[in-house]
Structures are given as C-alpha cells and as structure tokens.
Swiss-Prot record:
Compartment(s): Cell membrane
InterPro entries attached to this UniProt entry: AAA+_ATPase, ATP-synt_VA_C, ATP_synth_F1_bsu, ATPase_a/bsu_AS, ATPase_alpha/beta_chains, ATPase_F1/V1/A1_a/bsu_N, ATPase_F1/V1/A1_a/bsu_N_sf, ATPase_F1/V1/A1_a/bsu_nucl-bd
Catalytic reactions on record: ATP + H2O + 4 H(+)(in) = ADP + phosphate + 5 H(+)(out)
Leader peptide range in chain numbering: none
The protein's name in its UniProt record: ATP synthase subunit beta
GO molecular function terms listed in the Swiss-Prot or TrEMBL record: ATP binding; ATP hydrolysis activity; proton-transporting ATP synthase activity, rotational mechanism
Main subcellular location: membrane
Family from the record: Belongs to the ATPase alpha/beta chains family.
Coiled coil: none
C-alpha cells in the first residue's frame, strides 16, 4: 500500500501522484486520508483509478462529491478494487454505490465482500432457458413474452410509463416469485426510489429485495458504478444457486454517466457525443447479467430513449443484448391506452411456436396482422372516411380497434390515481380473449367495452351495462 498526493482536481476527476514504483492499478480503489486540517471534503472519500498517466500520476474518479478537495491532500491506495457487501445481510436494505447503508438501519452485518469488477461467466457455464415467465400484463404476455433467466428492455421516451410498467412487473413478478430481487436505481429520481421502498414495505416483500441507489443528484462516478454494485450482489445470490430478479432503472443514465466521465478524462467523443467505449462499457455490464448452470438472473431494464429516437447510439447498443424488447409509444399513450406498449414494435425471441405453442403463436400473429392492416388503412380513413372501405376492411378496422382497447389494462400500482383496481390476467385468459376477438365472436359488442378491463369476460359484462 502506498500513499500519494492530489496534484489536480477537475470536478469529479482527480489526478494523484504516487511514488513511481508504487502506482496503483487500473480500477483500484483509493481513499482520502484524514488530516487534522479543517476541510469540508467528505471523510474517507473513495476514488477509482481510471488511467495511469505516467510519472507516478494516476487519473481517478471520485465516488462522491469532490467539494472541498484541494491539491496536496493525501490519498491512500487500498491495492484492490471497490468491494461491496453481498449475501443475505443485504436483503431489505438500501445501499449506495460503495455498499454503505443509507436507510438509517445500522451497519450491514456481513463479512462477505465482493469486488464490483468481475469477469463475465465463460461460454460453457451459460445456461439458455425457454421457460416462460408470466407477467399478468396482457400485451406483454401475448406479443413479447419473457423467458425465465432472460433479459428484457423497456424502451420509451420521457413520460410514457417506463417506471410505472417496471413497478407493475415488480408487483406481479417479485411478489409471486418466491426468489430474491435486486433493484439498482441508476441516475433516476430519488422520489421514485422512495416510492419503490415504501411499496415493497407495504406489501411485505422488503426482506426479499436488496436495493442500491445512485440517483440523479449524485456525481457521475456513483451513477457509472452503481449498476455494477447491484449486479455484483445479484451475481453472489446467483452463484449460491438461487433464481434472481434484477431490475435496473435506468440503463441510459449508466451510459450518460460514462459519457460525462469520458469527456472529463479527455477522450475524444464519438457519434452524438457519446464515449468512444460505449459498446464495450455496455457489453461489460450486459455480459455479466446472465444465467449460469448454478442459478438464473432474469433482468428487467428500463431504457430511456432520447427524443423518442430508437436509432440513438445508446438505446441501439442496448438492443443487441436483449431477449425481449418492450417498446412504449407516445402515440399509443396519447390515445389514453395504458400500458402504452406498441404491439408492432415490441419483439421477443420467445415468440416461437416451439416455445410458446402453436395456439399462442397464431393468436399473437393474428393480432399483429389485424393491427398492421388498420395502420395501413388509417391514411385512407383520414382522407375519405370509413364509408369508402370495403366490407372486409371495415370489419378488420372494427376488430383492430377492439384489440387496441383490449390491450389496455388497469395496473395495481396505478390504482391510486386511476381509481380502478389493478388486474392480473393469466396467459390462458389472454390468449382466449384475443382469439375470440380475432375470430369474430365478439363483433356485435361496442369497442368501449374492451377498454381498461382485465379478462374478456369482464369486457362482455361491461358491454351489457353500456
């Protein structure tokens, strides 16, 4: 272990000079040595080495506010990467990027710690799975089903409901699921983290969830590493042979923190100002989120889409790593249909007759074909009106509008502001309902009957009252 001194501070990026023969390695953790002088710098502030500049100088990034730092302050090398507590003691607790508790419930009682930088599992250790994970959300179960041990991305612009969808998935899966969950809040609003904590507490599943937060107000170092902290805790449970749910809100902020750090480290930006190492950073994180022969990790990640542009480098790089993509659309949200999932844009590798079965596959494809036909006819309807359509097209449009409304569903987590109780719809019911609409059994019912209901029987009941 060696000590060095700060020679330059540029925001969260700090240059520290060590003796030439005792330079710390890349990703080693450094800590600020407490001196007797008065300073308002955070006590024991941690840094992570990012670059070795030469001549004993390393460039590090502060894992906390760099206020109060100045040249000449002493810094100690720990000789190992940042490590965080793992294991059962983390359950029910809220931690920061360094694994320190931030819930005022005392220290975390575990000796077991693990470095946040780990290699991804080897190719022969991976275990693909084809078991479906039922979510109880009609549109997801029908057109973009999730796999146990798979990776799911929720893509959407600002304010179309990524976090609400994620909370509903947590509500439906984590509460039904007997295993453990890890939630990583990466650069999101503190209020959402707070809501999540209380939601878990009220439903008595808090002792099955470990929470790690590095929110919007934190320096970029925290936001860049907090996803790895959460992932390390999830990996530790997986390696014990458990089935884990890993939630990340929001992957885009992880990329954004990387962009901030990259610019401060003096790297040349690449497309749209992102860091040149974007694909590698994303790969390092995503390749570790995987199921092995010992245990599974099912991950659900919210991905913010800047300016609703799915071709932006950040969401585009994320797409490559996912099994299912749930795309939330502003146009559908504008119609008042929630969850605002676009059934034509969302995809899943699981939607294959050999995995979901022939009936499910055919119903899903019928639904998509009907909606696609309606999409093509919209321009004609806008110019000439419905009367100019052929009888077959009129029928297709009327069915498509019923399908569109039947894809909406009241959420448990939105009960507070919608006033209608949430519905969990089993997969069999979902398939039966859409099959009835597509086959024409319900052509006589008004389309309003299908809006914001659970199963098809509720729609039929609602039609009687209209």
């Amino acid at each position: 272990m060696s000590n060095g001194n700060i020679v330059q501070c540029i925001g969260p990026v700090v240059d520290i000079q060590f003796p030439r023969d005792k330079m710390p390695n890349i990703y080693d953790a450094l800590t600020l040595v407490e001196s007797g002088e008065k300073s308002f710098a955070e006590k024991g502030l941690t840094f992570e080495v990012q670059q070795q500049i030469g001549d004993g100088v390393v460039r590090a990034i502060a894992m906390g506010a760099s206020d109060g730092l100045r040249r000449g302050m002493e810094v100690k090398s720990t000789g190992k990467p940042i490590s965080v507590p793992v294991g059962p003691a983390t359950l029910g607790r809220i931690m920061d990027v360094l694994g320190r508790p931030i819930d005022d419930a005392g220290p975390i009682a575990t000796e077991e710690r693990r470095a946040i930088h780990q290699p991804a599992p080897k190719f022969d250790e991976l275990s693909p799975s084809v078991d479906l994970l039922e979510t109880g959300i009609k549109v997801i179960d029908l057109v973009c089903p999730f796999a146990k041990g798979g990776k799911v991305g929720l893509f959407g612009g600002a304010g179309v409901g990524k976090t609400v969808n994620m909370m509903e998935l947590i509500n439906n899966i984590a509460k039904q699921h007997s295993g453990l969950s890890v939630f990583a809040g990466v650069g999101e609003r503190t209020r959402e983290g707070n809501d999540f904590y209380h939601e878990m507490k009220e439903s008595n599943v808090i002792d099955k969830v470990a929470m790690v937060f590095g929110q919007m107000n934190e320096p970029p170092g925290n936001r860049l590493r907090v996803a790895l902290t959460g992932l390390t805790m999830a990996e530790a449970f997986r390696d014990e042979g458990r089935d884990i749910l890993f939630f990340v809100d929001n992957i885009y902020r992880y990329t954004l923190a990387g962009t901030e750090v990259s610019a401060l480290l003096g790297r040349m930006p690449s497309a749209v100002g992102y860091q040149p190492t974007l694909a590698e950073e994303m790969g390092k994180l995503q390749e570790r989120i995987t199921s092995t022969k010992t245990g599974s990790v099912t991950s659900i990640q919210a991905v913010y889409v800047p300016a609703d542009d799915l071709t932006d480098p950040s969401p585009a790089t994320t797409f490559l790593h996912l099994d299912s993509t749930v795309v939330l659309s502003r146009d559908i949200a504008a119609l008042g249909i929630y969850p605002a999932v676009d059934p034509l844009d969302s995809t899943s590798r699981q939607l294959d007759p050999q995995v979901v079965g022939q009936e499910h596959y055919e119903v899903a494809r019928d639904v998509q074909m009907t909606l696609q036909r309606y999409k093509e006819l919209r321009d004609i309807i806008a110019i000439l009106g419905m009367d100019e359509l052929s009888p077959e097209d009129k029928l297709a449009v009327s069915r498509a509008r019923k399908i569109q409304r039947f894809l909406s569903q009241p959420f448990h987590v939105a009960e507070v502001f919608t006033g209608s109780p949430g519905k969990y719809v089993p997969l069999k019911e979902t398939i039966r309902g859409f099959k009835m609409i597509c086959s024409g059994e319900l052509d006589h019912l008004p389309e309003q009957a299908f809006y914001m209901v659970g199963s098809i029987d509720e729609a039929i009941e609602k039609a009687k009252k209209l």
